Design a protein with these regions (language model features):
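Generic structural signal for individual residues within well-ordered alpha-helical segments
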Residues: 8, 29, 116, 171, ...
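Short, solvent-exposed polar/charged micro-motifs at secondary-structure junctions
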Residues: 31-36, 145, 241-242
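Structural motif
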Residues: 235-246
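Short, glycine/charged-enriched hinge/interface segments at domain edges or termini
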Residues: 2, 55-231, 236
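Short, low-complexity N-terminal leaders and the immediately following helix N-cap/first helix
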Residues: 1-66, 95, 107, 126
Length: 246
């Protein structure tokens, strides 16, 4: 008879390194990363708005309030996915959507809720581009602006080896434009159940017998932790039978 710790040591010493494989990003959930993932780009890639609203120069809306709104001329509409075409000058603004690039000349965004373009009753905004707007609140420089590289900088390691890939990790990798990931192969693990008292689950119980339940528990645990279980049945309580199965 050997101790549990010695048995674990013997088993561990017999294991070989798990191979590495490349898998598509769509099949990488739950897999274990084998090497660093480094970003080649900044995220965001461009300075953009974090709110639907109006891109402004901070100095133009200084002192704006409910009783003393600032009036700005609207010179452009910038939905998400469009590149700005105008430089915003004094007392000018551009309507901008969340995620859209900031135009040249501005340094903040006023949320649409702080302008006369927001209908508080319907909690919506007009799709028509106004010629001018009223701004009811001042903002500080950088307000509602996401800067280049604010989340991830080019050259930054975003995921390290031996980490299990979660859904949010795959989303991040997709944002970096990476379609293939290097992961460890899933280890194949053989399961035997030992015991003269065991019966397969589809066989009716007899006196002194029990169903083989551990095989299903172990298979589920192995699958959950990333392995590939393979159940090879029940082995009787005989040394020769156990050795032969191994």
């Amino acid at each position: 008879m050997i101790s549990v710790s010695e048995a674990i040591q013997r088993l561990s010493s017999s294991f070989s390194s798990v191979d590495i494989e490349e898998v598509p990003l769509s099949q990488a959930a739950g897999r274990v990363l084998s090497k660093n993932i480094k970003s080649d780009i900044n995220l965001p890639l461009f300075t953009n708005s974090s709110m639907d609203g109006f891109a402004v120069r901070v100095e133009d809306v200084e002192g704006a309030g409910e009783d003393q709104p600032v009036i700005l001329n609207v010179v452009e509409d910038i939905p998400a996915g469009k590149r700005p075409s105008n430089k915003i000058g004094k007392n000018q603004t551009a309507r901008i959507m969340t995620g859209a690039p900031l135009p040249e000349g501005v340094n903040a965004v006023v949320p649409i809720e702080d302008t006369d373009q927001y209908d508080s009753g319907s909690r919506s905004q007009s799709h028509l581009l106004p010629a001018e707007i009223k701004v009811y609140r001042s903002v500080s420089e950088g307000a509602y602006v996401r800067l280049v590289g604010e989340d991830v900088t080019s050259g930054e390691v975003v995921l390290e080896p031996n980490s299990r890939l979660r859904p949010q990790d795959l989303g991040l990798v997709a944002m970096l434009g990476i379609s293939q990931i290097s992961v460890f192969r899933r280890p194949r693990i053989i399961i035997f159940s030992t015991g003269d008292e065991l019966l397969p689950v589809d066989v009716p119980l007899q006196p002194g017998k029990i169903h083989d339940s551990n095989a299903y528990t172990l298979s589920a645990l192995i699958s959950r932790d990333g392995g590939l279980p393979e159940y090879l049945g029940i082995v009787p309580d005989q040394e020769k039978a156990v050795r032969g199965s191994l």
